């Protein structure tokens, strides 16, 4: 069957379950937007600035547990979206950036807004795929999604010349690659179980990769709940991922992100084992590389992340497991519950008590105006249970983390993302 490259590209996006794309419409990819308009399953969200479009695509990816898609036109369009792409790279968030390039006949001639995207994006994307042949378009899209959503997730750019969109092609739609899920070695699982069993004051940090290789978020969150309750463990969601554990659950051990209050952090520092489950570990989470100390932690540390290259890059853990965090949780749940797990009950209760005290709607008056805590608490009165909050990356975000409780209402086997009470913080 003959179709235009633009139509093939639109079909390829549909094949990857994309239901919306974000953009500031530009002539460099106008063929694609024309093809998308003809499709009922994909909405075009028109934005006022590429920075907003790229952040929206990033948020869409986080909420739907797949790569979001942003369309940008040539050099300036991409430059406007760089902050969001940089954020997605640092946050290990999957994102596909489709860039409309100058026509092929004008390559290398300093055509209007021409840019070398491989050089520009080298430090903030996982890959830059340049397409110059009609037969490669759908394959390039499939590869982009696979790279963006695999291992350490992140942004991938696909560069397509303007004149290519209108050309005809016989190439088929390339379907998504199977989603892979890495499993831990049995000896690593045994060692982790032993480390947790021996620990009297463990702290479990959970991050975005907890969901990265999962087909069902509800199963992951349910299993995490079960592990926390059965093994008597405190769970601390990390920066930008507060929705991973109910902040009103008795095993909630406090949020680990921007400006953790000393009343909580000082008690956390008494831990004798930190299990980092699906968190890449950054300066924000580690409180400026001091908790744990880099490169040598001051307590036992286990790091679970689906990419072996990331483990040991900054911290040298006692145990590193390059595997799906959910598969690690499932492996632990298949083991017998430690007989003396109850010894950690007081440790969990004290952490939770300190966390709950921070949730109380109390703040000091500001001599020079309104304490931002008062603003956040007032906003919280009107939030729906499934509200999504967007925040900038400044320290003021700590007020949101502290005063707005995060929870999920259901944990059914086939729960959709709308059933989750989800809070999203987009930098």
Locate predicted features.
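N-terminal cofactor/phosphate-binding cores enriched in small/glycine residues
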Residues: 4-79, 83, 90
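Active-site diphosphate/adenylate-binding microenvironment
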Residues: 6-9, 14-16, 24-27, 32-37, ...
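Structural signature of the thiamine diphosphate
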Residues: 19-20, 58, 62-72, 76-99, ...
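Short internal beta-strands
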Residues: 23, 99, 233-239, 302-305
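Acidic, glycine-rich active-site loops and adjacent beta-strand->loop/helix elements
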Residues: 27-29, 50-52, 73-78, 99-105, ...
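Phosphate/pyrophosphate-binding active-site segments
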Residues: 135, 172, 194, 298-395
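Short connector loops at secondary-structure junctions
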Residues: 233-253
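Single conserved hydrophobic/aromatic residue that forms the stacking wall/gate
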Residues: 410-427
């Amino acid at each position: 069957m003959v179709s235009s490259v633009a139509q093939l590209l639109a079909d390829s996006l549909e094949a990857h379950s994309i239901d919306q794309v974000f953009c500031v419409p530009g002539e460099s990819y106008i063929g694609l937007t024309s093809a998308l308009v003809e499709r009922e399953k994909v909405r075009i969200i028109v934005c006022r600035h590429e920075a907003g479009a790229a952040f929206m695509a990033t948020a869409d990816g986080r909420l739907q547990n797949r790569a979001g898609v942003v369309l940008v036109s040539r050099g300036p369009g991409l430059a406007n979206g760089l902050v969001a792409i940089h954020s997605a790279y640092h946050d290990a968030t999957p994102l596909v950036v489709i860039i409309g390039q100058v026509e092929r006949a004008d390559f290398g001639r300093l055509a209007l807004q021409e840019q070398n995207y491989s050089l520009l994006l080298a430090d903030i994307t996982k890959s830059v795929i340049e397409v110059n042949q009609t037969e490669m378009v759908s394959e390039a899209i499939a590869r982009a999604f696979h790279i963006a959503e695999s291992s350490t997730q992140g942004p991938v750019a696909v560069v397509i010349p303007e004149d290519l969109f209108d050309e005809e092609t016989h190439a088929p739609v390339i379907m998504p690659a199977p989603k892979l899920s890495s499993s831990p070695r049995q000896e690593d699982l045994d060692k982790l179980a032993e480390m947790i069993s021996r620990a009297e004051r463990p702290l479990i940090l959970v991050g975005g990769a907890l969901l990265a290789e999962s087909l069902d978020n509800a199963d992951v969150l349910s299993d995490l709940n079960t592990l926390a309750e059965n093994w008597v463990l405190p769970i601390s969601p990390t920066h930008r991922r507060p929705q991973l554990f109910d902040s009103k659950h008795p095993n909630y051990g406090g949020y680990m992100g921007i400006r953790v209050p000393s009343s909580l952090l000082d008690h956390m520092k008494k831990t004798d084992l930190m299990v980092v489950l699906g968190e890449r570990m950054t300066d924000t989470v580690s409180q400026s590389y001091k908790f744990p100390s880099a490169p040598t932690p001051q307590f036992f540390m286990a790091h679970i992340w689906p990419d072996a290259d990331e483990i040991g890059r900054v911290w040298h853990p006692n145990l590193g497991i390059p595997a799906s965090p959910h598969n690690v949780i499932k492996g632990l749940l298949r083991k017998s519950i430690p007989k003396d797990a109850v010894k950690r009950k007081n440790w969990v209760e004290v952490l939770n008590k300190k966390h709950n005290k921070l949730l109380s709607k109390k703040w000091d008056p500001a001599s020079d105006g309104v304490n931002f805590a008062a603003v956040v608490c007032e906003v919280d009165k009107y939030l729906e249970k499934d509200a999504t909050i967007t925040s900038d990356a400044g320290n003021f975000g700590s007020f949101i983390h502290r005063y707005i409780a995060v929870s999920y209402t259901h944990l059914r086997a086939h729960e959709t993302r709308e059933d989750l009470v989800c809070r999203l913080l987009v930098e």
